[in-house]
């Protein structure tokens, strides 16, 4: 009896050992190919009928029970509908732009000055009062990448720098005039073939070294919209979709007064709404200024989120709060009035506030102490 039990136990152990060896030596199943992954992703989104439905469309169907739900048969169609439904439904509550602040990003691609197109928007009445200061400071070092967009002929300005574009737009500070200039800026950038488009106003100082570092951390072929919103929530607008139909739309936008940048990859996708005069008609759909229209095209129509960057500064913020020890890291600065007080960065330098109310000359000497007109004994 004992011998029989022992024989059975040995046979059971041998069988278990053989099964383990077969499992260990068997080839693992091959990983799914990309197309199969796509089909599985679509199946995971499918309802009982086996047909995938884009998120956001279910909510729309629930709001209108009789409305048909669009069927999705491929990943590309799914993401297209996802973008469209995001535009229609609006951003989720508390949604915010992706931040670019924090530790420096690794370099994605080295950039040369000729890779960047900086458009400076101005008007003829400010050629002397504002542009002369920029030409004396940061533009003097970076004429190759800077293009001035104005609304009137100025032979003296044209002789001083070769990159002056008379847009023939109105000199009024109106929604239509601002959009007219932005339309010309966009078209000139596309024609230039450069990698990055950056827009600033004539009251901005651009720290080009910091700008190149920032842009170099993003591939220009990807969809990148960099800037700083002036609002703490998405702007709400009314989008005209036909003669008798409007609908609400929500989106973030980077304020033009602080400057913003757009990659070439994204700018090319904006073409149906921005090129060849389409920008002005797009602006009329929401009846908002040029910088808002940029945000509308990028966020609401293309579904690309704004990347918030605190290194851009406008006169709408308290510039006294920018630490003097971090001025070399800032991409743009500004000046003006804030709460009925003079608003400029706080920096010690060779020029008094009376002689340098914008503090741009002092900032320039801080960044470029070898400038010929900067005092050699300057203390910052």
UniProtKB/Swiss-Prot annotation:
Species of provenance: Bos taurus (Bovine)
Site feature: Cleavage: 87-88
Cytoplasmic domain ranges by topology: 1-8
Residues of the active site: 291
Pro residues composition-biased segments: 90-107
Gene that encodes it: LFNG
Binding site for Mn(2+): 203, 315
Span list, region Disordered: 85-110
GO cellular component entries: Golgi membrane
Residues that bind substrate: 130, 202
InterPro entries in alphabetical order: Fringe (IPR017374), Fringe-like_glycosylTrfase (IPR003378)
Annotated protein name in UniProt: Beta-1,3-N-acetylglucosaminyltransferase lunatic fringe
Transmembrane segments: 9-29
Residue ranges annotated as Lumenal topological domain: 30-380
Function statement: Glycosyltransferase that initiates the elongation of O-linked fucose residues attached to EGF-like repeats in the extracellular domain of Notch molecules. Modulates NOTCH1 activity by modifying O-fucose residues at specific EGF-like domains resulting in inhibition of NOTCH1 activation by JAG1 and enhancement of NOTCH1 activation by DLL1 via an increase in its binding to DLL1. Decreases the binding of JAG1 to NOTCH2 but not that of DLL1. Essential mediator of somite segmentation and patterning.
CC cofactor note: Manganese is the most effective. Can also use cobalt with lower efficiency. Has some activity with magnesium and calcium, but not zinc.
Record Pfam families: Fringe
């Amino acid at each position: 009896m004992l011998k029989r039990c022992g024989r059975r136990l040995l046979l059971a152990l041998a069988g278990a050992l053989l099964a383990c060896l077969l499992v260990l030596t068997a080839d693992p199943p091959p990983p799914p190919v990309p197309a199969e992954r796509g089909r599985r992703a679509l199946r995971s989104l499918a309802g009982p009928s086996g047909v995938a439905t884009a998120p956001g469309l279910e909510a729309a169907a629930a709001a209108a029970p009789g409305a048909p739900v669009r069927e999705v048969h491929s990943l590309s169609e799914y993401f297209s509908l996802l973008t469209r439904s995001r535009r229609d439904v609006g951003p989720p509550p508390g949604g915010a732009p992706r931040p670019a602040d924090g530790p420096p990003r690794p370099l994605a691609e080295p950039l040369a000055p000729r890779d960047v197109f900086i458009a400076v928007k101005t008007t003829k009445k400010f050629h002397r009062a504002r542009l002369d200061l920029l030409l004396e400071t940061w533009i003097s070092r970076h004429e190759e990448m800077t293009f001035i967009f104005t609304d009137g002929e100025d032979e003296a300005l044209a002789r001083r720098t070769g990159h002056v574009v008379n847009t023939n737009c109105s000199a009024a500070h109106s929604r239509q005039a601002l959009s007219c200039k932005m339309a010309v800026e966009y078209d000139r950038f596309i024609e230039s073939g450069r990698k990055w488009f950056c827009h600033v106003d004539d009251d901005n100082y651009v720290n080009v070294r910091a700008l190149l570092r920032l842009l170099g951390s993003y591939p220009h072929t990807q969809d990148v919209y960099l800037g700083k919103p002036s609002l703490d929530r998405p702007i709400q607008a009314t989008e005209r979709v036909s003669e008798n139909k409007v609908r609400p739309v929500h989106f973030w936008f980077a304020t033009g007064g602080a400057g913003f940048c757009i990659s070439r990859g994204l700018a090319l996708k904006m073409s149906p709404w921005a090129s060849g005069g389409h920008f002005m008609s797009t602006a009329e759909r929401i009846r908002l200024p040029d910088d808002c229209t940029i945000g509308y095209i990028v966020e609401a129509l293309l579904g690309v989120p704004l990347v918030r960057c605190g290194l851009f500064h406008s006169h709408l913020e308290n510039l006294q709060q920018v630490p003097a020890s971090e001025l070399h890291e800032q991409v743009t600065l500004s000046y003006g009035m804030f709460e009925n007080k003079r608003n400029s960065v706080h920096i010690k330098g060779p020029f008094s506030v009376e002689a340098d109310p914008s503090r741009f000359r002092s900032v320039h000497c801080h960044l470029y102490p070898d400038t010929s007109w900067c005092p050699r004994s300057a203390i910052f």
